[in-house]
Amino acid sequence: MKWKMRKCPKDNIYTFKDTCQICGSKTVIPHPSRFSPEDKYVKYRIELKKGITLNC
């Protein structure tokens, strides 16, 4: 899905452009990813978040 609304991480300003109009930095998508109870990659995201390596 293509998101239209974007946010500058430095200025906390919302825009529709890929770069911030004030500071010129790259904007990010402020929306969280969708949740699925049947997510195959949940353990890898938890591993990245906690900084722990899980041996599969």
UniProtKB/Swiss-Prot annotation:
UniProt cross-references to InterPro entries, sorted A to Z: H/ACA_rnp_Nop10 (IPR007264), H/ACA_rnp_Nop10_sf (IPR036756), Nop10_arc-typ (IPR023532)
Question: Which keywords has UniProt assigned to this entry?
Answer: Ribonucleoprotein, Ribosome biogenesis, rRNA processing
Give the protein's recorded name.
Answer: Ribosome biogenesis protein Nop10
> Which sequence ranges form a coiled-coil region, renumbered to this chain?
none
Q: Which GO terms describe its cellular component?
A: ribonucleoprotein complex
- What task does this protein carry out? Involved in ribosome biogenesis; more specifically in 18S rRNA pseudouridylation and in cleavage of pre-rRNA.
One Pfam match: Nop10p
Keyword check for Repeat: no
Per the UniProt record, the source organism is: Saccharolobus solfataricus (strain ATCC 35092 / DSM 1617 / JCM 11322 / P2) (Sulfolobus solfataricus)
Q: Which domain of life does the protein's organism represent?
A: Archaea
